[in-house]
């Protein structure tokens, strides 16, 4: 099938909006911090003057990168107090890296003397570093995103709600190809014995990711807007959240074949009803949760509006969607709160 969306389109809202509204992502990735510390304690270190290289794959605005990368830097420095360290934050070229640089100068920064951060504006499903240059890699809640949409899926906005058939097969195929591409490039870039610590959206064997309730609400809102003439049918057909939450079998299946040893693989979860418990208690869940939902859906959804729409028209459609969704979340917050399933992998590059 031909692609309907080119690779390399940023899906996160910039200007710090995503960074300020990504509490669930950090909660989901926290379980991997111990694995990151363990990896930093054992990965091979380079001979001087070559710096150790830590790769951060999918940094977005950087808010959720400071704490885990501090774990990585501290772990490496515990072994060599003056080790020079490069930290490469990677994301799509359209990503807004400005908030990341601001955070690096703030109190939450991992920076210390001899640590050198920089950014790489390229897709993580392609080459990023030279051969055998990377020592430790980290990625949090990124690798379930698809490089592009291989097919339109009318009347559905989320892969876990798509029925078995050609569309679901196309999404699964794109996900599998992306995952293999990521592993192939990292296997090339890592030194022997280098490690990756990765977290991502996952599905249980029964096919559920824990976010179905929210996305069913979204589907209902989109259908209402088409019925009311606020959204065109062709636009609605293209709107989709471009992710595939792999099962554990899908996550681990190609790993050893592509040059890695699996040191740890865990399936955990994070509950947004707990993450936003105070909001539920005081009746403000919709007010507090909607910015998170908007941060992850605004660009993926509304880039598909027809090109003839004016700026004001596009803004009106977008605001109408989130106003309607706010009402649905407020009416049934427990159904909207996601119970995300999360995979954690610790992988070691086998000797060539």
Regions found by a protein language model. Give the residues of each.
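A short glycine-rich, Lys/Arg-flanked "PGG" loop and its adjoining helix->strand segment in the class I
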Residues: 152-192
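C-terminal target-recognition/interaction regions appended to catalytic cores
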Residues: 284-352
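N-terminal charged/capping segments associated with class I S-adenosyl-L-methionine
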Residues: 1-117, 122-132, 145-159, 163, ...
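Substrate-binding/catalytic lobe of Class I Rossmann-like enzymes that use SAM or dcSAM, i.e.
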Residues: 192-312
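Hydrophobic beta-strand segment of the Class I
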Residues: 137-138
């Amino acid at each position: 099938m031909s692609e309907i969306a080119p690779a390399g389109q940023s899906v996160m809202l910039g200007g710090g909006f995503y960074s300020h509204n990504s509490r669930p992502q950090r909660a989901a990735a926290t379980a991997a911090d111990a694995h990151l510390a363990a990896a930093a304690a054992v990965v091979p270190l380079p001979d001087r003057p070559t710096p150790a290289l830590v790769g951060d794959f999918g940094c977005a605005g950087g808010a959720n990168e400071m704490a885990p990368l501090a774990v990585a830097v501290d772990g490496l420095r515990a072994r060599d107090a003056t080790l020079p360290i490069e930290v490469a934050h990677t994301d799509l070229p359209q990503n807004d890296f400005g908030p990341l640089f601001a955070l690096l100068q703030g109190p939450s920064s991992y920076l210390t003397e001899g640590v050198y951060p920089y950014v790489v504006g390229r897709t993580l499903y392609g080459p990023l570093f030279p051969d055998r240059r990377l020592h430790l890699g980290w990625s949090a809640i990124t690798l379930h995103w698809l490089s592009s949409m291989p097919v339109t899926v009318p009347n559905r906005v989320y892969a876990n709600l798509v029925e078995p058939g050609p569309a679901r097969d196309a999404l699964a195929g794109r996900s599998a190809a992306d995952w293999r591409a990521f592993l192939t490039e990292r296997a090339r870039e890592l030194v022997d014995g280098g490690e990756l610590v990765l977290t991502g959206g996952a599905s249980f064997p029964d096919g559920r990711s824990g976010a179905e309730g929210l996305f069913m609400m979204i589907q209902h809102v989109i259908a209402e807007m088409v019925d009311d003439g606020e959204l065109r049918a062709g636009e609605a057909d293209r709107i989709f959240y471009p992710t595939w939450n792999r099962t554990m079998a899908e996550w681990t299946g190609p790993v050893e074949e592509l040059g890695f040893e699996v040191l740890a693989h865990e399936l955990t979860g994070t509950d947004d009803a707990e993450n936003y418990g105070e909001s539920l208690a005081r009746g403000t869940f919709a007010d507090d949760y909607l910015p998170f939902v908007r941060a992850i859906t605004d660009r993926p959804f509304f880039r598909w509006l027809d090109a003839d729409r004016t700026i004001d028209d596009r803004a009106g459609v977008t605001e109408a969607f989130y106003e309607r969704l706010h009402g649905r979340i407020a009416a049934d917050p427990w159904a909207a709160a996601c119970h995300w399933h999360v995979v954690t992998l610790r992988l070691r590059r086998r000797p060539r």
